[in-house]
């Protein structure tokens, strides 16, 4: 088809989604009959009106840019279509592609009551969590007190063990002393020459 010519004037309009940034030279198009024919060919199967108008415009822009051999922003296409058609009226008259009936709606009282009860339960849970956050200090004191009593009990048991061991040591020491005394007496009796048994031996 024909090539689009660059002119000096620009047009104002809204940009659609997916539009790439372009230079001022690309934003101006001289709409010759050949260029308009390219636009109409690009619009086959796509209506730039209704709720999906921006998606259709993306397809129109891509096809139109491919036909004329240069990138054209969708703003330029919107502005040119606005000079030929009443786009706002067409948009309002476009039938929605899906059912969209409007009817009055009242939220059931049961749901409102459930929401209120849920809020009360959440508040109670938050209060319990706050109490648990404060209570761990008391629990730590209980742990410390119980550990202290355990420490005292272990100290008592160790002292009892020491007493028993010392008592056993004293008894063993006394027994050793008694044994040593007996052996000393026996030795002195055998070694004493004045004993009667030694005298008898000498006489014989």
Swiss-Prot record:
There is a cross-link at residue 127 (Glycyl lysine isopeptide (Lys-Gly) (interchain with G-Cter in SUMO2)). It holds the Pfam family Eaf7. The modification Phosphothreonine is found at residue 22. It comes from the Eukaryota. GO terms for biological process: chromatin organization; positive regulation of DNA-templated transcription; positive regulation of double-strand break repair via homologous recombination; regulation of apoptotic process; regulation of cell cycle; regulation of double-strand break repair; regulation of transcription by RNA polymerase II. Residues 1-27, 128-204 are annotated as: Disordered. It is found in: Nucleus. The keyword NAD does not apply. The modification Phosphoserine is found at residues 23, 191, 195. The modification N-acetylglycine is found at residue 2. One of its GO terms (cellular component) is nucleoplasm. Residues 1-15 have a biased composition (Gly residues). Residues 189-198 have a biased composition (Low complexity). Residues 128-140, 153-175 have a biased composition (Basic and acidic residues). Keywords: Acetylation, Activator, Chromatin regulator, Growth regulation, Isopeptide bond, Nucleus, Phosphoprotein, Transcription, Transcription regulation, Ubl conjugation. Component of the NuA4 histone acetyltransferase (HAT) complex which is involved in transcriptional activation of select genes principally by acetylation of nucleosomal histones H4 and H2A. This modification may both alter nucleosome - DNA interactions and promote interaction of the modified histones with other proteins which positively regulate transcription. Component of the NuA4 histone acetyltransferase complex which contains the catalytic subunit KAT5/TIP60 and the subunits EP400, TRRAP/PAF400, BRD8/SMAP, EPC1, DMAP1/DNMAP1, RUVBL1/TIP49, RUVBL2, ING3, actin, ACTL6A/BAF53A, MORF4L1/MRG15, MORF4L2/MRGX, MRGBP, YEATS4/GAS41, VPS72/YL1 and MEAF6. The NuA4 complex interacts with MYC and the adenovirus E1A protein. MRGBP may interact directly with MORF4L1/MRG15 and MORF4L2/MRGX. Belongs to the EAF7 family. This is MRG/MORF4L-binding protein. It comes from Homo sapiens.
């Amino acid at each position: 088809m024909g090539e689009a010519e660059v002119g000096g004037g620009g047009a104002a309009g809204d940009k659609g989604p997916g539009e790439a940034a372009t230079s001022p030279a690309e934003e101006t198009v001289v709409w010759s009959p050949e260029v308009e024919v390219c636009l109409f060919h690009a619009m086959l199967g796509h209506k730039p009106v209704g709720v999906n108008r921006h998606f259709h415009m993306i397809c129109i822009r891509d096809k139109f840019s491919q036909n004329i051999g240069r990138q054209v922003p969708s703003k330029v296409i919107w502005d040119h279509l606005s000079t030929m058609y009443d786009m706002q009226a067409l948009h309002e008259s476009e039938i929605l592609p899906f059912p969209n009936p409007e009817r009055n709606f009242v939220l059931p009282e049961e749901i409102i009551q459930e929401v209120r009860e849920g809020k009360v339960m959440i508040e109670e849970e938050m209060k319990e969590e706050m109490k648990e956050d404060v209570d761990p200090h008391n629990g730590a004191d209980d742990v410390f007190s119980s550990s202290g009593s355990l420490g005292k009990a272990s100290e008592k048991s160790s002292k009892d063990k020491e007493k028993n061991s010392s008592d056993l040591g004293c008894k063993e020491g006394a027994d050793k002393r008694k044994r040593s005394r007996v052996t000393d007496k026996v030795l002195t009796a055998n070694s004493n020459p004045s004993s009667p048994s030694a005298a008898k031996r000498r006489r014989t």
